[in-house]
Amino acid sequence: MSIMSDIDVYKKSTGDYEALQERRPDYTGARNAFLKLASVYLKDKQSISVADFCCGTGNNTKLIADRYSVSKATLIDINEEFLQIAKNADINATHVETIYSDILKVDLKPEHDLVISMFAYHHVADGDKKKFIDVVKNALKNNGILLLGEIYSPDRSTTLAYYNHLLDHIPLDLKTPELQKFLQQTAESDDFEYKVSRVFAHKQLTQAGFKLLDEIKVWPIDQTFNRDVGTFVEVWKLIG
């Protein structure tokens, strides 16, 4: 993976990135689903070790650490500015470690109860996606949990239609030229966005020894696309 992208916002400040993402119903909906599923599958954990893949500014780990006892939080990203913000985010964990690395090259011990992967898998080229899953697997304890947020799309035309539909559902007062450019570049990206079908992802995870425990389809909730297209948050358990 490379931070160099054909999507301009990834080359700008983190504030620009976060502000644009907050206007997306799929993004904000995924965060709500993430917390809802965490409340079910982490509620009985006394103290957890968390690894956050492609963590960005650490928001998802912070959301977990504010609600559950976290013994260690390991945050991995290839963007140094994002990691610096994560370091200063006052994450409520006994120990916080940040790792500046390509996620495919990181070597983690199988000591984590939870791996967070929110919109990270589709930034990995298709030929490397199995390796990404292997890195997740190697980081987890047996029976560990993967919280996976993903946008599933089987082909480029569906991806373009998804982002057009998304833009149509953003209120006019939030639909700035910057947001429109961001979504258009994301839809058309061929060097930072590698979306795949839900069937493709589920096959890889199942073959790696994961079992799907739960899921929430976040967006869209209408019938524009078939059931397997859109933004999902899923709970996977490592069983083998």
Residue locations for each model-derived region?
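Short catalytic micro-motifs in class I SAM-dependent methyltransferases
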Residues: 119-120
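Conserved class I S-adenosyl-L-methionine
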Residues: 2-44, 59, 63
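C-terminal alpha-helical "lid/dimerization" subdomain adjacent to the S-adenosyl-L-methionine
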Residues: 149-208, 217
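Core SAM-dependent methyltransferase catalytic element
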Residues: 209-211, 217, 221-240
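Class I SAM-dependent methyltransferase SAM/SAH-binding core
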Residues: 51-53, 57-105
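A conserved beta-strand element that flanks and buttresses the S-adenosyl-L-methionine
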Residues: 116
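A short glycine-rich, Lys/Arg-flanked "PGG" loop and its adjoining helix->strand segment in the class I
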Residues: 130-142
